[in-house]
Amino acid sequence: AGLRAEEFEKEVASHDNISEKEREELIKKGKFAPSYMWNVNGWLCSKLGLHVVSQTQKSVPQIAEHDIYSSTLDMTIPKGHCTGMSAVVTTKTKEGITIQSECIGKVYDENEFDCNDWTIMGEPNTRVVIERPSTVELTCATVINRIVEVLCAEPGYTTTDQMPENIYKAFN
């Protein structure tokens, strides 16, 4: 937050403006910096039995329309500077289905709030909107409810798409 748009393009977004071959090389070397939506799209494809043929991401600056004070950063972000970014990941599959996800992380102005907005286009089109979700609590609950699966997982690296569905566990 606080970067001018041209600084954002140079320091953040330019990392996405590479060829598929360059991206594959970075992934092989462990030097690719994906947004956290990158893994979500792959997970969804795996759970739906889809086969990924290509995946791209784009970082889009979120620009302040007026000065915004951030108590967390203890700074004022001037109008026209970045308040954060949107990560847009587009995944195309062998089956002809495209999954596009976007996650916006930014400093909110006084009239903004967290919102989960999911649209599934198909038959029928479906949209789910959750305004002001308990983001911190949901994130913590997801981690806590995974402890049993992590402890019971096979040795080595296991991706979450290979684990059982993450469900709430009630303990007596």
Model-inferred region functions:
Residues 107-172:
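C-terminal helical cap and adjacent loop that interface with cofactors, partners, or active-site loops
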Residues 1-106, 110-114, 133, 140:
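Active-site-lining helix/loop region of Rossmann-like oxidoreductase modules
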